[in-house]
Regions:
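Predominantly extracellular/luminal cell-surface or secreted proteins
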Residues: 87, 102-106, 164, 246, ...
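Intrinsic, low-complexity N-terminal interaction/targeting segments
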Residues: 50-54, 110-137, 203-222, 269-288
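Short, structured interface segments
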Residues: 158-169, 312
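C-terminal functional regions that serve as terminal interaction/effector modules
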Residues: 152, 220, 249-252, 258-334
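Short, surface-exposed beta-strand/strand-loop-strand elements in extracellular ectodomains
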Residues: 94-107, 253-265
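Disordered, acidic Ser/Thr/Pro-rich linker "stalks" and the adjacent N-terminal cap
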Residues: 1-70, 74, 166-235, 251-253, ...
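Beta-sandwich interaction modules
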Residues: 78, 120-157, 227, 238, ...
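A short beta-strand element within beta-rich, extracytoplasmic domains
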Residues: 79-90, 150, 239-249, 299
């Protein structure tokens, strides 16, 4: 299927970035935690447990009275939601005919009971679903959200719930003088890449370590004289002091070399790290001897291959701090 452009935005709810399904009113047939698993749903015919066919998703019992079923997800990356996907893969005679999505923004770590008592904002009104399908719904909201609530009408099964968007970090929870300028969770974003054949370049700047090769960025094998690259708009204008290029899990397919370039406008580039030899399955750390202000970063790998993570440690400039803080404030009132 042709996927909407906004599905290229990271999944703010994914377990891989720290999301959690904190509550569901019912999960008799299949556990709520399946909703945010990062991998694609699977189906194994004739795999029955003591409650029936085992599904890789969230499935509630058949309702015999009016009502709806709900699940609340705490976003691993609070941010502006651009769209959601309600994936009913492999649910055919037992998918919900309708779904709706709401959101709320709250500080701290409220309990499910406290969350349920809040006033929620509708992101997706009650909308029809198709069975065994990805059901995408674009969202028009400029606010920063911390939790979303999926309602299914009246009951049934959903394989995955994807909440795509742009992370917006809370400056009150960060040391803006020393943090990862290229981190997705801090608001950095991929603006371009030469190739994403095996996996998304968003993985490069995702939280935590990659646990397997598939959690990094890997390109197809090149058969020409070129090289692959990724460009990133940083969390804000800053001065980097240390770069980390991590090839963990990439053994026979790590790049041979890499370089870093910086820019203040995304068009005019200067050298940050010269072309440097890399080793397979290794976290490389490079102090930057002549740090300069930059707002964009370009990673070039030679000629192709896979990288697990890219980190760029440093501090925001005065202008970077101002823009970083204003982005958060604007999304709070959006």
């Amino acid at each position: 299927m042709d996927r909407p452009e906004w599905t290229a935005d990271p999944d703010l709810a994914s377990r891989r970035v720290g999301g959690s399904v904190v509550w569901a009113n019912d999960e008799l047939f299949a556990e709520r935690e399946n909703l945010i698993k990062p991998e694609q749903p699977e189906f194994r015919p004739w795999s029955f447990g003591h409650k029936g066919q085992i599904y890789d998703g969230w499935e509630t019992r058949r309702r015999r009275e009016p009502g709806i079923d709900q699940a609340i997800v705490r976003l691993g990356l609070p941010g502006v939601v651009t769209g959601v996907v309600v994936d009913t893969a492999f649910f055919t005679g037992n998918y919900p005919p309708f779904a709706s999505v709401e959101a709320v923004a709250v500080d701290g770590y409220p309990s499910p009971g406290e969350l349920s008592a809040l006033d929620w904002t509708t992101l997706v009104p009650k909308s029809a679903l198709k069975g065994d399908s990805e059901n995408p719904f674009q969202v028009s909201s400029s606010r920063r959200w911390t939790h979303v609530r999926l309602s299914i009408h009246p009951d049934g099964g959903v394989a995955r719930f994807r909440v795509h968007g742009r992370p917006v970090a809370d400056p009150r929870l960060l040391d803006l003088g020393s943090f990862d300028l290229a981190a997705l969770e801090h608001g950095a974003r991929v603006t371009g890449a030469s190739n994403m054949f095996y996996s998304s370049p968003n993985n490069l700047i995702s939280p935590g370590f990659a646990s397997v090769m598939g959690e990094g960025w890997e390109t197809a094998r090149r058969r020409d004289d070129g090289n692959d690259w990724v460009e990133i708009a940083l969390a804000g204008e800053g001065v980097p002091r240390l770069a980390e290029l991590d090839t963990s899990h990439f053994k026979g397919n790590a790049p041979g070399w890499a370089s870093l370039s910086g820019s203040l406008d995304g068009e005019t580039w200067f050298e940050v790290l010269p072309r440097t030899r890399l080793q397979p399955d290794t976290r490389h750390r490079f102090p930057l001897e002549q740090p300069r202000e930059l707002s964009h970063l370009r990673l070039d790998i030679y000629p192709d291959g896979g990288m697990a993570r890219l980190r760029l440690y440093g501090g925001l400039t005065e202008r970077g701090r101002s823009e970083f803080t204003e982005r958060f404030r604007a999304a709070q009132s959006g």
